[in-house]
Structures are given as C-alpha cells and as structure tokens.
A protein has these predicted regions:
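Phosphate-backbone recognition surface of nucleic-acid-processing proteins
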Residues: 1
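Extended substrate/RNA-proximal surfaces in nucleic-acid metabolism proteins
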Residues: 6-89, 134-238
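Residue-level detector of anion-binding/catalytic polar loops
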Residues: 29, 120, 241
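Histidine-centered catalytic micro-motifs
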Residues: 88-103, 124-129, 209-215, 246
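Active-site mouth loops of central-metabolism enzymes
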Residues: 92-109, 185-191, 221
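Metal-associated gating/positioning segment near the N- to mid-region
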Residues: 101-131
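C-terminal structured "cap/appendage" subdomains that terminate the fold
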Residues: 244, 248-251, 255-258
Length: 258
C-alpha cells in the first residue's frame, strides 16, 4: 500500500479531507492503509498514487495542486492545468550577482550555470543603488565579454529599480531606456499606498516587470496590502509582466494569484 501511504503523507490535510469526503459519497473509505469498499469490506491497496487516484475516478493530481481548491473536480473533469517544469524554462529574468551585496556569484559564474542548464538567456538585474557612479557602465563591459564567450547564450543587461514612496523610480528614464530588461520593485514603505505606487511604476514605458509584487518575506514580513486584481488588469493593458518569484522565502506572486 505504498501509494496509499505516500498520498496520505504528502497531503495537504485539506486535500485529504476533501478526498475522503468525496470517497464516502461513493461508498468508499480512504485511509493510509488503502481504500475500503464499505458494503463488502473489501480493502484495495495501490502501489502508486496514480493507481489510487484512478480507482477513485480522478486523473493524477500533482502534489503542488493538492490544496482543496477545486482540484478534485478539475481532475474528474479533465481540467487540471499543465504545470511548468524546470525543462520548460528558457531563462531567468531576475538575478543578482556580486555587483549587489546579496549576490553570490559573478556574472561569468551565473551565466555559465544558466548556460549549463540549457537556458537561452539570463537577465542581470542587480539592485540599482549598487550600480551608481559608473558601476553600471563597468558592468556592461563585463556582460559584453561574457556574451562574446557564450554566444548564442545571452546575458541581458538589466536592473532592479526601487519604487519610491511617491511611485517614481530611483533610476533616470534615460538610463532605463538603454537596458534590455527593467524590474521595478517595492523595497521600502510597504504600508504607504503600495497599489498606487505599483500602478505608477507600470505606467513607466521602460518598466518591463514588477518584482515580488506584495513584498512578503515568509516568517519575516507580511505582504503589503496590494490590490492584485487591479494591478494585474493594468499590467495586462500595458504589457507589463508580474514576476512569480520562487525564492523559498518569497513565493510572490502566490500560487492562487498565478
């Protein structure tokens, strides 16, 4: 009954409760030990989760979707979404190198790692306040050298600009215009009109993406009170991307947003 036990321990709890309640309506009892046909007392066990879900009338539900958020109905009706897998990724559009204090690798090291993964590009988006006084231009020379060595792989010249309290960015428009990819993010004053500030950043024609939209840091900082639907609607109108930041302490946008 490995499949039964694996499914039970994988959870989530809410998903398992919903699964068991649905099974009861079919005259079945689901536990980590197997599926019992209530009328006959017969116990069925399964070697895999796939076999268990199929017996209950569902397509296999990936663990990431097991949140009691309509996935059982979707699995029964063949409407489960196709999940993005690592092999689907063509590149990373938000990265920090040692040009920023929070970066761990050099431009060359990061580009080599991305290239080794089969990616086609890497956007270098170091924090704007570390790229002043000629440092952005010096970084451009380093990027050019890496690109010459790894072509056709390409490091995109970018930046992560701060959205100020008044909604303006801390980088001049003429500087942003010369870059390949611009991320704008909230890093301060999270309680000061975050929705309006993000909307102002979206209106900047040089901004390609809003980074970690709500600014949350799990176990460290709650998410800002951002009207996600309003922001998403305007982003769609302007063609501005909203980042899904998969850093374990961010997960921002959240799965429900995506």
């Amino acid at each position: 009954c490995y499949g039964d036990l694996l499914q039970h321990l994988t959870g989530s709890k809410d998903h398992n409760v919903a699964l068991r309640e649905a099974a009861v309506r079919q005259g079945l009892s689901v536990s980590e030990y197997g599926v019992t046909v209530v009328e006959s007392g017969e116990v069925r066990t399964f070697a895999t989760e796939e076999e268990l879900y199929a017996f209950l009338g569902y397509a296999f539900i990936p663990p990431e979707l097991r949140e009691a958020a309509g996935e059982l109905e979707a699995a029964r009706e063949g409407r489960l979404p196709v999940l993005v897998e690592p092999g689907d990724l063509r590149g990373d559009l938000h990265s920090h190198s040692t040009w920023s204090a929070d970066g761990k690798g050099t431009v060359a090291e990061m580009a080599a790692a991305a290239h080794a993964r089969g990616h086609e590009y890497l956007a270098l988006t170091d924090h704007s306040h570390y790229l002043r006084e000629g440092r952005l231009e010096a970084q451009a020379e380093e990027v050019a050298a890496v690109n010459a060595r790894l072509a056709p792989f390409r490091v995109l010249r970018g930046i992560e600009a701060n959205i100020r309290a008044d909604g303006s960015l801390d980088v001049a428009d003429e500087t942003l215009a010369g870059l390949d990819w611009v991320v704008a993010s909230l890093h301060t004053a999270f309680d000061s009109s975050p929705t309006e500030r993000i909307l102002a950043a979206i209106e900047n024609p040089h901004v390609d993406c809003i980074g970690h939209l709500t600014g949350r840091r799990l176990s460290r900082r709650r998410e800002a009170d951002v009207d996600v639907e309003r922001v998403a609607a305007r982003a769609a109108e302007t063609g501005t991307s909203l980042e899904i930041n998969s850093q374990p302490d961010r997960l921002d946008l959240r799965d429900a947003h995506a």
